[in-house]
Each structure stands twice: as structure tokens, then as C-alpha cells.
């Protein structure tokens, strides 16, 4: 897993990227937390292209839609329901992605009231024998706040196969 903004501040990730993607290709799971548009060390930190945007969902109570309700990220090992998005603090997510390669799956969507739906908060792709996940949801706020649903979702990401 890479931390928030790692591809903005850790310049050595540019050289380490082939090793990280080899890890995924050989059966590993890599979860990349959000990055900003500015000063990315790579055009796209994933195995397939996507772009980072300034899109965000700032209303923490904004509904989350299950675009792919049978997706493994929403079912394994924890069954995720709308209740798992209750009690979030400050916002849902930030720097959502756009213009992603069709090999990425987008199991979730959300938006602030009166704004268009945003699908780019969570990208999931099989790469070789492994899984690559890019997440724009704000785990760095939800986990320290002890939001139970955030822990369930996070566990699903790190255990994805």
C-alpha cells in the first residue's frame, strides 16, 4: 500500500514502479491511496492509464451507489451495505480519477447534492495474477475516526485477490 500523496512526494516511486507492478503481476495486491494533480512523479501510477482530477465529494453524508453490487470489493471478506458509509467524517473522498482505461472496474459512485455522479473514487483492475486498486476515498480520516464501515471496506481492499 502506498500512502496519501505518495506519488506526489516520494520521487523514488518513479524508479520503484516497475517492481511494484511486477509484485502485482506475480499475484500481489497493491492499494494506492489518492494523489493530487500537481507534481505526480508518473503520468499514471497504475498498470493502465488513468488521470487524477480535482473532483471530490465533500458531503460526508452523500449517498454512495453500488455500481457493481456483486463486485469482490463489496463482498469479500465483508459484505458492504449502505450502512457502512454512515458516520463518515468531513468528506467522502477527493482527487477522484477520470479518463481511466476500460480494464479498470468502478464498483462505487457518489456525488455531492446537485453535482453529477462521480465513478472515479475507486478503481480496481486485474493485472497479471494480482490486483491493483486506486482509491480516492479518504481512509486517512475515516480509519482514525473509528468508522466501522471504513474498516470493513479497507479490509476488503487489502485482501483483494
Language model features with spans:
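Helical hinge/lid and interdomain linker segments adjacent to catalytic or ligand-binding clefts
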Residues: 1-51, 116, 129, 135-142
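Short acidic-hydrophobic sequence patches enriched in Asp/Glu that either
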Residues: 12, 56, 149, 153
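Short, surface-exposed patches at the edges or C-terminal ends of soluble domains, predominantly
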Residues: 119-122, 134-151, 155-161
Amino acid at each position: 500500500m502506498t500512502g496519501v500523496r505518495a506519488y506526489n512526494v516520494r520521487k523514488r516511486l518513479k524508479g520503484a514502479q516497475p517492481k511494484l507492478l511486477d509484485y502485482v503481476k506475480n499475484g500481489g495486491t497493491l492499494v494506492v491511496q489518492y494523489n493530487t494533480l500537481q507534481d505526480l512523479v508518473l503520468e499514471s501510477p497504475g498498470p493502465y492509464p488513468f488521470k487524477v482530477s480535482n473532483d471530490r465529494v465533500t458531503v460526508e453524508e452523500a449517498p454512495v451507489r453500488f455500481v457493481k453490487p456483486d463486485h469482490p470489493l463489496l463482498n469479500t471478506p465483508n459484505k458492504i451495505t449502505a450502512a457502512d458509509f454512515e458516520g463518515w467524517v468531513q468528506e467522502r473522498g477527493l482527487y477522484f480519477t477520470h479518463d481511466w482505461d476500460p480494464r479498470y472496474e468502478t464498483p462505487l459512485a457518489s456525488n455531492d447534492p446537485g453535482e453529477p455522479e462521480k465513478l472515479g473514487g475507486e478503481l480496481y483492475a486485474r493485472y497479471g495474477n494480482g490486483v491493483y486498486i486506486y482509491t480516492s476515498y479518504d481512509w486517512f480520516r475515516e480509519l482514525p475516526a473509528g468508522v466501522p464501515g471504513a474498516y470493513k471496506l479497507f479490509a476488503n481492499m487489502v485482501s483483494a485477490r
